[in-house]
């Protein structure tokens, strides 16, 4: 309960002149963008954590096994954050509290590590050495200013492994430029669109972690939801799938096993309309990700090819067509997203899955 909620003189808007109040919507937009960014990054890490855990079980047992996903050693999935500003701190806190990442598997490189005392008390290692962070981490989040990014890329590009995933929040630097700066293709960059006529649902008096535990706010962050006026470009979701394929390819896993594994992991949350017969639910097929001509010549034992994630997010892919033409697949992914944060959708909470741009 917020004891200051009804005290008008203590509200942010109180000191804003009447003629400037038309700009107050930007405050809600900024807050909503922060919440969405942290939510989508956390969802991504949850998926990758579960995927790597399942791959570890598969390699140790020499057969496909996806039970008890969280039994793998959590230290095997390492996350690094470059930038200790507001976004970097909020992201670290969200991953630690709502994600599967323990403190010892999360590190931050920032020019002023002494300002991150609260995070260090939680066990997160904070220091200033970008190259060391990149050589250690499996996923690297770029939470820096656009002006800082070129120098950071010079520092880190030689430390990137082929399988390292770079996740950039630096909206001002387009993907082709970032690919060139890093000499790297395994890059994800979410893009957001704004609806100026929307009503803010972002809960002005809640922190990011508390906001993502509110069912209304969490559902507003769903990839296909326009609620709150911030819409995620669905090319990001395609990039997430192809990033998962690259992880499996790095393990030299047969594509037939990969499809079975990803179907189990990504399409495992069913909704009421599925009923007891889940056999009719979507399953991932080879031609969902590669052309029919390529798939025809790919033997069952061969892994998927290595995908350029920057190209996936900039061009049409087989999965673009499959995803846009399958509302059932969209609904399954929406339910998976909400379930990953502990929220179950009901008939009173409809899935919104059509009519949004995917450019």
Curated annotation (Swiss-Prot):
Keyword hit for Magnesium: no
Keywords for the protein's UniProt record, in alphabetical order: Oxidoreductase
InterPro entries: NAD(P)-bd_dom_sf (IPR036291), P5C_Rdtase_cat_N (IPR028939)
GO biological-process terms attached to the record: L-proline biosynthetic process
EC number(s) from the headed UniProt entry: 1.-.-.-
Gene Ontology MF, one: pyrroline-5-carboxylate reductase activity
Pfam families xrefs: F420_oxidored
Family: Belongs to the pyrroline-5-carboxylate reductase family.
Function: Probable oxidoreductase.
Name of the protein in question: NADP-dependent oxidoreductase domain-containing protein 1
Species for this entry: Homo sapiens (Human)
